[in-house]
From Swiss-Prot:
This is Heme exporter protein B. Signal peptide: none annotated. It is a multi-pass membrane protein. Belongs to the CcmB/CycW/HelB family. GO terms for biological process: cytochrome c biosynthetic process; cytochrome complex assembly. The chain crosses the membrane at residues 17-37, 50-70, 99-119, 126-146, 155-175, 190-210. The gene is ccmB.
Length: 218
């Protein structure tokens, strides 16, 4: 399992799907928003929680199609399906690698991007906490979508259409936690729901993704 994780981390960085791409896209989103809505600090601070979460969500979406695509092309996916390690475990490892390359760097760098959007000071710890809780669900749901669309031509578009609706609950509670933190209210309720979504996703999505892979490998 450790060897598979290290291999996937190396592949992610070498194949152009590393954290640099996700961070660059996140920066572009946070930079362009003030041009669209105006530079007024009050307006930006009100919409900052939602914009930051949408930016993180879209940044995670960029490299989802690579989770299984390279292994499918070189035949490694067939070997994983017949390896002693259960396919569900391999799916979980690949989702973890995706999160380490995209979700974790986004969560840790989000306060810097929050400055660009005049995010209120009290919201910063809740921004990081919500992203640390929510982005694992994004990676795991993305792994499920990648498993369903692996091997399809132009599967990236279908992957986006499949995964984005599944991201909505995480987006709602993640942005709400940051919004409550910015207003000085208690964000714990939103964080509890966010954690519940992530735990449910981590428990169920590997089995769904493994089943989809077995169907596509027949």
């Amino acid at each position: 399992m450790k060897a598979l994780l290290i291999r996937d981390l190396r592949l992610a960085t070498r194949a152009g799907g590393g954290f640099g791409l996700a961070l660059a896209f996140f920066l572009i989103v946070c930079t362009l928003v003030p041009f669209g809505v105006g530079p007024e600090g009050g307006t930006l601070s009100r919409i900052a929680p939602g914009i930051l979460w949408v930016g993180a969500l879209l940044s995670c979406l960029l490299s989802l199609d690579r989770i299984f695509a390279l292994d499918f092309e070189d035949g490694s996916l067939d070997l994983l399906a017949t390896a002693p390690l259960p396919l569900e475990g391999a799916v979980a490892i690949k989702a973890l690698a995706h999160w380490l390359v995209t979700g974790l760097p986004l969560a840790l760098s989000a306060p810097v991007f929050g400055l660009l959007l005049h995010l209120p000071g009290p919201a910063y710890p809740w921004l990081v906490a919500s992203l640390l809780l929510g982005t694992p669900a994004l990676s795991m749901l993305g792994a499920f979508g990648a498993a369903v669309t692996v091997g399809l031509r132009r599967g990236g578009l279908l992957l986006s259409l499949l995964v984005l609706p599944l991201y909505v609950p995480t987006l709602i509670f993640g942005a709400e936690a940051v919004r409550r933190g910015a207003a000085g209210a208690d964000p714990m309720t939103a964080l509890v729901f966010l954690a519940a979504i992530t735990l449910a996703t981590l428990a169920l999505a590997p089995f769904a993704a493994a089943a989809a892979l077995r169907v596509n490998l027949r």
